[in-house]
Amino acid sequence: ILVKLIVHKNKAVYHYQSVRNTQTDFPVLTCAAAKRADGAYRFIIGARPGRAVLFEASAETIQALVEEKQKAETKADADTRENKDKAQIEKKAVCLATWVRDQVQTSSNMRGSAEYRKHLTGVLIKRAVRVLEDR
């Protein structure tokens, strides 16, 4: 008999998305994302077929990914602060999307091919990071 259940609350913001062929169809791919107070991200990719998989990126990992991308780009812009903030968010979104997309294992079925699901993974991660950074 279950007597007590304790759920610890974590300060975080959350976002969920799914891609479906039709509104009432099973999803082709789902993405749940969380940004914790310490700057770390958690992404859960589901409906891929197989069990949902978790990807965690600490703030240090994210910073390393962004710095690696910045080294590849040697362009120096004199933008406004707002544009720089948006550019930083976009770089973070692209880096995290690439990082998760390269790791996720997908397969094909009647709802979508493995390549399509990999592409959707990147798109959904980018969207999630943009939304979570704006909150």
Mark where each language-model region is.
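C-terminal structural segment of proteins
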Residues: I1-R135
